[in-house]
Structures are given as structure tokens and as C-alpha cells.
Amino acid sequence: MKKSITTLDLNLLLCLQLLMQERSVTKAAKRINVTPSAVSKSLAKLRAWFDDPLFVNSPLGLSPTPLMVSMEQNLAEWMQMSNLLLDKPHHQTPRGLKFELAAESPLMMIMLNALSKQIYQRYPQATIKLRNWDYDSLDAITRGEVDIGFSGRESHPRSRELLSSLPLAIDYEVLFSDVPCVWLRKDHPALHQTWNLDTFLRYPHISICWEQSDTWALDNVLQELGRERTIAMSLPEFEQSLFMAAQPDNLLLATAPRYCQYYNQLHQLPLVALPLPFDESQQKKLEVPFTLLWHKRNSHNPKIVWLRETIKNLYASMA
């Protein structure tokens, strides 16, 4: 028989979401500042109400049951709606508005000043929180911790970062596509040699650790050719790789999106950009569609719609 929500303590649903996120009774307890015993008792009540174990112990922590997995999206949406309801008194005026974004650092830095001006012009008391895009950012959008993400995806058929691989709950719009370039200092010895694949692979490379991986579509293309680059340094951000490639007497090559030219101009880095030495079909596999990402529940949220349109217009003016 269907149970009434009036028989459930709604605080238990917060505990359930934290258990799903943390996969640990102890970690969930720390999040809400209670004892692990209290969380265990809450889990026991939830198991009785749903008539399901919800989680089972595994070597990696709590593993959700099929029922729990099926409820995850609904639970996240319920929590998001609850937060919006509780924040309603603070969001009746612009004073309460908060804009939370996750983006690749140089991608956002080249337009953050212009974006913040437009936000403050419309919402003078708003606050802006910007975080770097990382492996957890899509989950942060799902959890309601990020309004909009702005990140590059990949085009190589074997990539895990294809647009077609995005979670069903995520909506997106491609703002522009970019093909990465090779960035090297203006007096690099490679500039005095024929620019081809052999020259490209002759020198050590800086790699970007992207969503917990040191390799990307470039390495897939090289593997298809039976070749491999020497990765001498791995860094978390494109701007760090450009900074290192620009250092005097440095033989390192950085591969970064063409849009980084705006970043180089801002910081006057002594770098030259060369095309990746591949044919047209290989270049196509390296295309990076830079994409706005948001949760479907926010598709008609006036704040998110306005933010999306503002970012789109800013990048259109740069094209």
C-alpha cells in the first residue's frame, strides 16, 4: 500500500542524500554535525519506510541498491526545490541573488570582468562564486551547487568527454568550437626546423590533468599513428602550461585551445602558436566544442536563462 509522506520525517531525506553523496555513515555524520550512530539510526528508519536496504556495505563504502539508484535524481531535484523554497525570502530582491559558475580558468578569466559588470548592473547586490571546472563539476550541477558550467568537451569517438556522453539530466548549448594549437616561446629551436610530426614529438610536452586524466584526444590520435609524446610535466590548468612554456631557455611545448590567444595578449606572454601537425581528419577528432551546461530543472529558471544569454552575447562579441 502506498505510504503517505506525512508518516515520514523529511529530515531523513537530507540524511539519505548525504549518504548517497558520501557513501559513508561517518562522512555523512560530519556533514550535518551529528554522531555516526545518529545517522545509522536515521538509515534504519529509512530502510523501514522504503522497505529496502537502500545501501549495502562494500570494500569501497556504502553501495546503493537499485531502488536507491532509481531515486537519486528525484531526491536531488527535491532537495533543490526545497532549497529554492527556503531561500525564497532572500531572493525576492536582487540582494539575495547568488551566481555560481564552474569554468575552465582562462576561459572564464578572459570575460569575467565583462560578465561581472553586467551581473552587478542588473543585480547590484548579487554575489558571484566562480570555481574551476574539475571532475566533480557535472555532479555539482546535478546537486544544485553550480548554476552553469562552461567547459570544453571532446570530439574523438573514443573519448569519455563526448557531448553524447553527458548525463540525461544535463542540458547544454555549444557556444563555439576550437582546435588546439601548440604554444612555444618565440625563440624556441623548433621554430628553426621544419614543422611536422617528428619536430612536434622531438621536444618534451606539458600535459593538462583533465578530469583526473593526464591524456586526452591528442594522445588517442597519436596512438592511432603508432606514436607517443614525451610528457615531462603535468599541470592542472591551461594558463599554468602557457606560463611554463614561456619561460626562458625552456624546451617544453604546451598544447592549449586557440582561444588562449586572448589570455596571452592580456598577460603579454612571449609565445608563438603553431597548428598541430595533423591532417584534416585527425584535426577533426581534436575539435573542442566549448559548451554551456546546466541542469534540466533550471531550463526555465529566469536567473539561469538570463545568465546563459549574457554569457552567449559576451562570447559572440569576441568572435
Curated annotation (Swiss-Prot):
The keyword Calcium does not apply. One of its GO terms (biological process) is DNA-templated transcription. It holds the Pfam family HTH_1. InterPro entries: LysR-type_TF, LysR_subst-bd, Tscrpt_reg_HTH_LysR, Tscrpt_reg_YidZ, WH-like_DNA-bd_sf, WH_DNA-bd_sf, YidZ_PBP2. GO terms for molecular function: DNA binding; DNA-binding transcription factor activity. Keywords: DNA-binding, Transcription, Transcription regulation. It comes from the Bacteria. Residues 25-44 bind DNA. Residues 8-65 form the HTH lysR-type domain. NCBIfam families: PRK10216.1. Involved in anaerobic NO protection. Belongs to the LysR transcriptional regulatory family. HAMAP family: HTH_type_YidZ (MF_01607). This is HTH-type transcriptional regulator YidZ.
